[in-house]
């Protein structure tokens, strides 16, 4: 199951990179994510990647059919998150989270929560808002 997840995450990242590279520069999230929509993802953390250029949060969600769906959420860089008071230990596996994201235009379980970013982890509200 772990290798299937790694393959899926790798394929999603590769596909997102291939779709956005010709259309926009580094911060061209509009090509991949729908900025006019917001979706609240509520579930359990499976992983949190604390690395440049963007951190990533992985959340397992139970959909309306009772099926598990694994979401990948792109977040700000560790430097931006540090200034907001976050650390590499802000999220750990099995934490209950709620994250407001702009969803993927492709309809896949991928979203972006950059600036501003609102998250609730184990009942505690966190945010990132840079000028």
Where are these regions (language model features)?
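Bacterial N-terminal signal peptides that target proteins for export
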Residues: 1-11
């Amino acid at each position: 199951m772990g290798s299937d997840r790694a393959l899926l995450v790798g394929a999603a990242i590769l596909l997102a990179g291939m779709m956005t590279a010709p259309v926009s520069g580094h911060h061209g999230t509009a090509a991949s994510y729908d900025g006019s929509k917001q979706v609240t993802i509520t579930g359990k953390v499976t992983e949190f990647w604390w690395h440049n250029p963007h951190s990533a949060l992985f959340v397992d969600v139970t959909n309306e059919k009772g099926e598990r769906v694994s979401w990948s959420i792109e977040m700000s860089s560790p430097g931006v998150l540090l200034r907001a008071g976050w650390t590499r230990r802000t999220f750990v596996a099995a934490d209950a989270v709620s994250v407001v994201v702009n969803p993927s235009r492709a309809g896949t379980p991928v979203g972006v929560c950059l600036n501003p970013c609102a998250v609730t982890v184990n009942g505690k509200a966190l945010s990132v808002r840079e000028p």
